[in-house]
């Protein structure tokens, strides 16, 4: 087994080799909790959830840490607008974030540290940087990192200092020695949360938080650091500078994290999703209209490093494909029930290999689609199933569930999933499920009375509204086209 990942630091695909055999330490930058999570968060955290699932399925003991930033300028601004305590506001939106992640089927990290609970560690790390000459306190209560002291500052982002200086500036009231320097500690301001420090009361800057929490919960160096590609600069660039300067004499980026992985953006009509453009969707906006597993399935259809376009149309198509997968699993489990165990289908190992190759989920879904086509052909073949055919169907169903467990899909009873997906689709189309059920009952009565003209008329009327009836041994069920 060899797992290959695209490493942002080296811009190459590399074999993922943990520092300690059999164990892997992963840190993912979590959300700044000042509002409900958006589709970009859904994409990001589904990606890293699949990474964790696959690494564990491959036998690695993964320690997964993802933080909450609950002390930040945006949180303070939002809290002031609402007349609310900043920490309380952040806690409320952290709870909402958990609800959204649960709806998407994401596993909880092993540790979820919060900035507000790690102030002593942050202060100690800043003091260490000052002691080592990488940070300075100009005397106004702020502390800054001296960027030019760190020789590999632009290595992750592939930027040099000359390029960066053109866009750098010193804000009024700042006491930076260099426009490139960034704040590690900010002096207290009225109405803001603040903590004691050697430089006076204040609060941490954004970047130092993750460095301190990574070191406390994973040590240094760690194996893998991940997040959205918008964090490459400045956040992850600054994390490297802080963490390496505090813990290593070699001053190489690998002394903090051996590998760096970043996921792409969610776009709307080829533009990055943003509130200013009016194309912003929260996870809750989408889950009010679509099933959570369908959204997850949709997100897995694009390689994690690529940007992709979101629309209701493509999500509805993903929902339809997921329903088809569940229909096939239902048939395979029903027809293969009680069959003697068969060998694991070849598609399962092919799926593992695709995930080993930089977590290629679109390729996995393509492999699964091929296998489902074969399973459908076998399940729909007329006549009684042989013992061998039943065993093949049972093996397919187990294989589908195994691949699904790594992707975080196909984990519900088919009837439950199909009903949930159908009901969301019906609601979007303005179809009343109760009315459909009454029409089905009326059609059943017409058929019992041999009034087939009436039966066909009811069926055709429902079909015209996008409702497809399916007659089976257990009665009539329905779905939305």
From Swiss-Prot:
Please give the name of this protein.
Cysteine--tRNA ligase
Task: Give the protein family.
Answer: Belongs to the class-I aminoacyl-tRNA synthetase family.
* PANTHER family, sorted: CYSTEINE--TRNA LIGASE, CYTOPLASMIC, CYSTEINYL-TRNA SYNTHETASE
Cellular component (GO) terms are:
cytosol
Which residues participate in Zn(2+) binding? 29, 210, 235, 239
Q: Which UniProt keywords apply?
A: Aminoacyl-tRNA synthetase, ATP-binding, Cytoplasm, Ligase, Metal-binding, Nucleotide-binding, Protein biosynthesis, Zinc
Its cofactor is: Zn(2+)
Quote the catalytic activity from the record.
tRNA(Cys) + L-cysteine + ATP = L-cysteinyl-tRNA(Cys) + AMP + diphosphate
Q: Which GO terms describe its molecular function?
A: ATP binding; cysteine-tRNA ligase activity; zinc ion binding
* Motif segment ('HIGH' region): 31-41
Gene name per UniProt: cysS
How is the quaternary structure described?
Monomer.
State where the protein is found. Cytoplasm
Q: What's noted on cofactor binding? A: Binds 1 zinc ion per subunit.
Q: Name one GO biological process term.
A: cysteinyl-tRNA aminoacylation
Q: Where is this motif: 'KMSKS' region?
A: 272-276
- Top-rank taxon of the source lineage equals Bacteria
Q: Where does ATP bind?
A: 275
Pfam families per UniProt:
CysS_C (PF23493), DALR_2 (PF09190), tRNA-synt_1e (PF01406)
Tell me if Ribonucleoprotein is a UniProt keyword of this record.
no
Q: What is the lineage of its organism?
A: Bacteria, Pseudomonadati, Myxococcota, Myxococcia, Myxococcales
Is 4Fe-4S one of the keywords UniProt gives this record? no
State which Enzyme Commission number(s) the record gives: 6.1.1.16
């Amino acid at each position: 087994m060899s797992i290959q990942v695209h490493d942002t630091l080296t811009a190459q695909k590399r074999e993922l080799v943990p520092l300690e055999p059999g164990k892997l330490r992963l840190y993912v930058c979590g959300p700044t909790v000042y509002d409900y999570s958006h589709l970009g968060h859904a994409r990001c955290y589904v990606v890293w959830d699949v990474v964790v699932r696959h690494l564990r399925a491959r036998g690695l003991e993964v320690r997964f840490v993802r933080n909450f930033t609950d002390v930040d300028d945006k949180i303070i601004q939002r809290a002031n607008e609402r007349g609310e305590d900043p920490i309380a506001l952040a806690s409320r939106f952290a709870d909402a974030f958990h609800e959204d992640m649960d709806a998407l089927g994401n596993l909880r990290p092993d540790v979820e540290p919060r900035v507000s609970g790690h102030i002593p560690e942050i202060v100690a790390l800043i003091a260490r940087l000052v002691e080592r000459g990488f940070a300075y306190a100009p005397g106004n209560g702020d502390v800054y990192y001296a960027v030019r002291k760190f020789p590999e500052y632009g290595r992750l982002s592939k930027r040099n200092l000359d390029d960066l200086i053109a866009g750098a500036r010193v804000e009024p009231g700042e006491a930076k020695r260099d426009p490139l320097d960034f704040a590690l500690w900010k002096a207290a301001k009225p109405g803001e949360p603040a903590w004691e420090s050697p430089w006076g009361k204040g609060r941490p800057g954004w970047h130092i938080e993750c460095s301190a929490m990574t070191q406390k919960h994973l040590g240094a160096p760690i194996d893998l650091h991940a997040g959205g590609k918008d964090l490459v600069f400045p956040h992850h660039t600054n994390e490297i500078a802080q963490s390496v300067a505090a813990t290593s004499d070699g001053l190489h980026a690998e002394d903090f994290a051996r590998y760096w992985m970043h996921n792409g953006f969610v776009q709307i009509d080829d533009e990055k999703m943003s509130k200013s453009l009016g194309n912003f969707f929260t996870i809750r906006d989408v889950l009010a209209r679509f099933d959570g597993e369908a959204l997850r399935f949709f997100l897995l259809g694009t390689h994690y490093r690529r940007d992709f376009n979101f629309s209701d149309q493509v999500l509805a198509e993903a929902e339809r494909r997921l329903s088809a997968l569940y229909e096939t699993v239902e048939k395979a489990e029903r027809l293969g029930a009680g069959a003697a165990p068969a060998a694991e289908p070849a598609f399962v190992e092919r799926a593992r290999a695709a995930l080993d190759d930089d977590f290629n989920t679109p390729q996995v879904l393509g492999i699964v689609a091929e296998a489902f086509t074969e399973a459908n052909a076998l399940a729909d073949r007329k006549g009684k199933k042989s013992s061998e055919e039943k065993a093949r169907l049972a093996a397919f169903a187990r294989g589908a569930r195994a691949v699904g467990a790594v992707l975080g899909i196909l984990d519900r009873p088919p009837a439950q999933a199909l009903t949930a997906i159908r009901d969301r689709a019906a609601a979007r189309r303005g179809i009343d499920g109760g009315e459909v059920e009454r029409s089905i009952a009326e059609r059943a009565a017409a058929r019992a009375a041999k009034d087939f003209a009436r039966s066909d008329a009811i069926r055709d009327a429902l079909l015209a509204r996008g409702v497809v009836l399916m007659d089976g041994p257990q009665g009539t069920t329905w779905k939305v086209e």
